[in-house]
Amino acid sequence: MDVWEWVVAAILGLVEGLTEYAPVSSTGHMIIVDDLWLKSSELVGSQNAYVFKIVIQLGSILAVALLFKDRLLQLAGFKKQAATQSEGRGLTLGKVAVGLLPAAVLGLLFEDKMESIFHVRTVAFALIAGAFLMIAADFINKRNNKKKQQVDDISYKQALAIGLFQCLALWPGFSRSGSTISGGVMLGLTHRAAANFTFIMAIPIMVGASALSLIKNWDALDISLLPFYATGFISAFLVSLVVVRFFLKLINKIKLVPFALYRIALGLLLLFLFS
């Protein structure tokens, strides 16, 4: 493996870590950084490049699982809930499952059709459409004078509604974080609470989707490229650790509009570059 391959793997892992959980669409950034600049498919072959992107996504997932390990242990029943979370209050595995259900079902039913509509223009329009949803979410949340709810206040009904918003992420470029955080704040959650629920829901659905993709493409896994895969995985893991912590600290202060404006600019850039 030459130096350039190490650099490409590290940069793509960096991009994955920066964008997978921020509401800005990792897909749109990968198009610009990889398809226009680094061209990993030319470097290692299209199938290996596809497998690599699955691997770096797993690095990001592992980072979030580590950050939320206490909550995950609680949901799995290995750690007791706080006393204040008794009598039906508190986030439960059932609520997470309800939130996962809509996107999981639609994803299984329409996976091939969603892949068939993947095109730079559809990604660009998804970025812009998602941006307007995020702006609307901040507007609605600001006008809601009721006390904003925390993640342990989420009801089954709210979990299902957020899960329905997550279905928008099946449109390539819309962003899972963008759609679900927007849904959460529209329903009266704080931005951080919506982000927490989003990241917790993302772990099982992304593990499932990545594992399924990896199994389907197992024959394409090139053992000689393990250092390439490992470099990207580690890069994505470490960057995701930092980005998610930073994002959760800031999101209640900066809200969604700054990300929305960035998405509009990125969407317009993609339309210009690929017009």
Swiss-Prot record:
Disulfide bonds listed in the record: none
EC number in record: 3.6.1.27
Q: Where in the cell is it found?
A: Cell membrane
Q: Which UniProt keywords apply?
A: Antibiotic resistance, Cell membrane, Cell shape, Cell wall biogenesis/degradation, Hydrolase, Membrane, Peptidoglycan synthesis, Transmembrane, Transmembrane helix
State the InterPro entries in the record.
UppP
Reaction it catalyzes:
di-trans,octa-cis-undecaprenyl diphosphate + H2O = di-trans,octa-cis-undecaprenyl phosphate + phosphate + H(+)
Which GO CC terms are listed, alphabetically? plasma membrane
- EC category name: hydrolase
Q: What else is known?
A: Bacitracin is thought to be involved in the inhibition of peptidoglycan synthesis by sequestering undecaprenyl diphosphate, thereby reducing the pool of lipid carrier available.
NCBIfam families membership? PRK00281.1-4 (NF001390), undec_PP_bacA (TIGR00753)
This molecule's function is given as:
Catalyzes the dephosphorylation of undecaprenyl diphosphate (UPP). Confers resistance to bacitracin.
Tell me the protein's name.
Undecaprenyl-diphosphatase 2
| Organism per entry | Shouchella clausii (strain KSM-K16) (Alkalihalobacillus clausii)
